Every structure is written in structure tokens, then in C-alpha cells.
Amino acid sequence: MHGSALLCCCLVLLAGVGASRHQSTLLEDDCTHFPASLPHMLRELRAAFGRVKIFFQMKDKLDNILLTGSLLEDFKSYLGCQALSEMIQFYLEEVMPRAENHDPDIKNHVNSLGEKLKTLRLRLRLRRCHRFLPCENKSKAVEQVKSAFSKLQEKGVYKAMSEFDIFINYIETYMTMRMKI
């Protein structure tokens, strides 16, 4: 019995190691498949934004730009991962909830846009693609965006939503750069 129990333990251990190696391979495969879905996800974001774009751009009467070149530079730098994460969080938690309340006709469209952004965020987190989100530092450019947004008060929502297409372009730039690494 002692020998068969030892053999059984060894088989269980080997099965566990094999399963964990298979799981690791699946996670790595999922990671490598993420970039293939990027164009589709960006198209969905752009289509969802297209449903509210005119509304917010018509209401945005300000000449200044909220999403500046310094934010794009952070997206291109080693802080790109954090800048992307912080900007997604900013739009989901600060901008979109306020934008939904501006007109009942656009509420569902803004909500749909938010769901698409959440899907992107979930894909980044659940896949644990460290190649795409490898760092933990804070982005100064994102802090500047948030500060400018706050100073604009009610007009900040129009400004941030009217520039959402710029944000999508920055996401695309960041992800395209990361795929090449």
C-alpha cells in the first residue's frame, strides 16, 4: 500500500504541474491574442462615440484642449501603462457618470460607450498582459487633465466627452507601440 500511495501522490503532483503549465500557456496565448482583437475593440469604441460626438462637440464652446500632447507623451513613455489605466478610470468614474445626466436622449449611448471602455479595461486586467500594463507609477499628465477638468466645472464634461476621439487615438497609439515590443 505504501508504494501505491507514493505512486498515487507522484501522479497527482505531476498532473498538477501539467495543469498549471497548460494554464500558464493558455494565459500566455490569451495575452498574444489580445492585440488581434484591438482593431475590433477600437472600432466599437469609435462607433459608440460616434453616437454622442456631435452632441458633446456642439456643446463644447471652449478653445482649449484638455487631452494635450503631454498626455500622448506619457502614453508613449514608460508611464503609458499607468496613464492608460488612469485615463480609463477617469472617464468611467468622473466624466461619463456626469455626461449621462446631460440629456436623456444620449444617456443610453454614453452608457454604451462606458461599457465598451469597461470591456477594454477588463481585457487588460483579466488577461494580465504585463507586456501591455507593466508599471505602477502615476502620470503627471493625467493629473493635469483631471485638474483642468475640475477647473472647467460643468463645461469640463463637454470638453472631456468632445475629445473622447483623441483619447481613443491615444489608446491606439499606446497599444500599437506595445505590440511592437
Swiss-Prot record:
What subcellular compartments does it reside in?
Secreted
Q: Tell me the Gene3D superfamilies matching this sequence.
A: 1.20.1250.10
Query: Which PROSITE patterns does the entry link to?
Result: INTERLEUKIN_10
Can you list the disulfide-bonded cysteine pairs?
C31-C129, C81-C135
Check the record and name the Pfam families matching this protein. Answer: IL10
Carbohydrate attachment residues: N137
Task: List the molecular function annotations (GO) for this entry.
Answer: cytokine activity; interleukin-10 receptor binding
- UniProt keyword terms in alphabetical order: Cytokine, Disulfide bond, Glycoprotein, Secreted, Signal
Record's Gene Ontology CC terms?
A: extracellular region; extracellular space
GO annotation terms (biological process): antigen processing and presentation of exogenous peptide antigen via MHC class II; immune response; interleukin-10-mediated signaling pathway; negative regulation of B cell proliferation; negative regulation of cytokine production involved in immune response; negative regulation of inflammatory response; negative regulation of interleukin-6 production; negative regulation of membrane protein ectodomain proteolysis
Q: Which residues form the signal peptide?
A: 1-19
Subunit info here reads: Homodimer. Interacts with IL10RA and IL10RB.
**Family indicated by similarity:** Belongs to the IL-10 family.
Q: What does this protein do?
A: Major immune regulatory cytokine that acts on many cells of the immune system where it has profound anti-inflammatory functions, limiting excessive tissue disruption caused by inflammation. Mechanistically, IL10 binds to its heterotetrameric receptor comprising IL10RA and IL10RB leading to JAK1 and STAT2-mediated phosphorylation of STAT3. In turn, STAT3 translocates to the nucleus where it drives expression of anti-inflammatory mediators.
This chain belongs to the protein called Interleukin-10
